[in-house]
From Swiss-Prot:
Part of the 50S ribosomal subunit. Contacts protein L20. Belongs to the bacterial ribosomal protein bL21 family. One of its GO terms (cellular component) is ribosome. The gene is rplU. The lineage of its organism: Bacteria, Thermotogati, Thermotogota, Thermotogae, Petrotogales. This is Large ribosomal subunit protein bL21. PANTHER family: 50S RIBOSOMAL PROTEIN L21, LARGE RIBOSOMAL SUBUNIT PROTEIN BL21M. The keyword Nucleotidyltransferase does not apply. This protein binds to 23S rRNA in the presence of protein L20.
């Protein structure tokens, strides 16, 4: 059984006990539940449901595992022959969600 959900501006294909990494979700602590109710597609053994735009009555229950920062991405600006170099770094924050249950 799997589902395709729309969350935080992106689509994720999820299965039970899977951990997904999404952009940081504010105001939720690790251990809390987050309900994803925008289910686009739901597939059971032989039953498949596609939403228009979302599957009615379907939801995915997740648990917040952790908040963290991704690895550093370096941004370099460089102009040759002008002695101009700038280096900057960025670490994107993320939230790890564990899929507990898929209903629908």
């Amino acid at each position: 059984m799997y589902a395709i959900v729309y969350f935080n501006g992106k689509q994720y294909k999820v299965e039970k006990d899977q951990v997904i990494y999404t952009e940081k979700v504010k105001d939720v602590d690790p251990g809390n539940e987050v309900v994803l109710d925008k289910v686009i597609y739901l597939s059971k053994e032989e039953e498949k449901k596609a939403g228009k735009p979302y599957v009615e009555g379907a939801k995915v229950i997740t648990e917040v595992v952790e908040h963290g920062k991704d690895r550093k991405v370096k941004i370099i600006k460089f102009e040759g022959r002008k002695n101009y170099r700038r280096e900057k770094g960025h670490r994107q924050e993320y939230t790890a969600l564990k899929i507990k249950e898929i209903e629908g």
